[in-house]
Amino acid sequence: MRRRLTLIGAGALSLVLFGAGAFAADGLARTRRVLYNFDGDSCLATRAGGKGPVAVTLDDVKRLIEEVAYEGSQVDTVLVCVNAQVMYYPSTVGTLRGTQSTPAERARWPASEAQRFENLQRFFAKGVDPYAVMLSETRRRGREALLSFRMNDAHGNDFLRTKFWTDHPDCRLGNGALDFGRDAVREYVFRLIEEAVRRYDCDGIELDFNRFPTFFKDVAPAQRVAAMNGLVERGRAMLDEVGRGRGRRLVLGVRVPSNYGRTPPTLATCREVGCDLAAWVKSGSVDFVVVSEFMFERYDLPIHPWKDALPGVPVYGGIECTEGGSRALYLTPEKYRRAARCLWQNGADGIYLFNFFTTREYEADAFEPPFEVLRDLGTRPAAVPAP
């Protein structure tokens, strides 16, 4: 901000400061009792009552939002993930999911991936963007509609392979991830984020550093922080530019990197991998922070230290959908409520749900997620004082 102010006259200074203040107030004042993250690939291979991969219709896509943003639901914010190294839409910057796979690899795809690829191809061939529909339905129902962007997905599947990965072997970190120590990687990732924000009529974007929390190969911590600070600041400036054109502040949220479940994430462990949350909040770049585990629910996530260190922005606590890797370990309604109580007691400003819908991915053994808990997870227990 200081560098920008040296370039404008005194008459414009008050306007810039007033605009920034108005933007900040709008971004921070919003209530988010429950934030619901949609994995953009999973929701395009299953549907309500499905027992396996199915052809998804436009009505199915709209129903995805109806299921979580129904009357009485406490879901105030819906996040739609549109990438995992690949993009889930035809991109001029990146690679559409599955298009870099060879015919031999496609022949080995599981039925779920084959159906997902077919669904995406069919929608876009007809000129229908299912993610634009999801965001539009979310806003029509009066909810905040955000994109979610996985910063460095490392699943490593062939259908997540990108042209950038193929063309830049020097930028690889392993198993599909990229080395953010490379200028070319940070430029590429920024351009992907910018493309998504400009493409979709969204209220902002979440940068998901928890998918996956590895970013650098052989760079010292201070250099990691400087590199990531530059990327986040650039993202904030881009959002402000786009937001001015849309007449509203576009939100920037961050889901912090975990420790792969070894220990709960802390500000120190995040900074070690390049994510200086305190600096991002202090600079005004970030509007909210999500703290969560990696994959499995532990019921012990401390939020108070984050609240103490990051005054001025809400800190939300994430619930993982399962206690382990089997169908039997998915959270029951009571376990979701237990997890929410723990987060509220530990200082959370709201509840964040990730992979909630993945019970539908068990094909013949698929079952519906407990949508009924969306009515109460966002209620702060009476015994827990408001911040």
What are these regions (language model features)?
Residues R224-L231, L250-R298, R327-A340:
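Extracellular glycoside hydrolase catalytic/binding regions
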Residues L28-T57, P103-S136, R140, A145-R199, ...:
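Active-site-adjacent "subsite" loops/lids of carbohydrate-active enzymes
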Residues G324, R341, D349-P387:
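Aromatic- and carboxylate-lined catalytic core of secreted/periplasmic carbohydrate-active enzymes
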Residues R2, T6-V80, A84, A386-P387:
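Mature N-terminal, pre-catalytic/accessory segment of carbohydrate-active enzymes
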Residues N37, L135, R139-N157, E206, ...:
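Aromatic-lined carbohydrate-recognition surfaces of secreted/lumenal glycan-active proteins
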Residues D59-Y88, R199-G204, S285-V291, L343-G350:
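Catalytic domains of carbohydrate-active enzymes, especially glycoside hydrolases
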Residues V75-F124, T214-K217, F288-E293, H304-P305:
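Aromatic-lined carbohydrate-binding/catalytic grooves of carbohydrate-active enzymes
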Residues L44, D59, N83-Y88, F124, ...:
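Acidic-and-aromatic substrate-binding clefts and catalytic sites of carbohydrate-active enzymes
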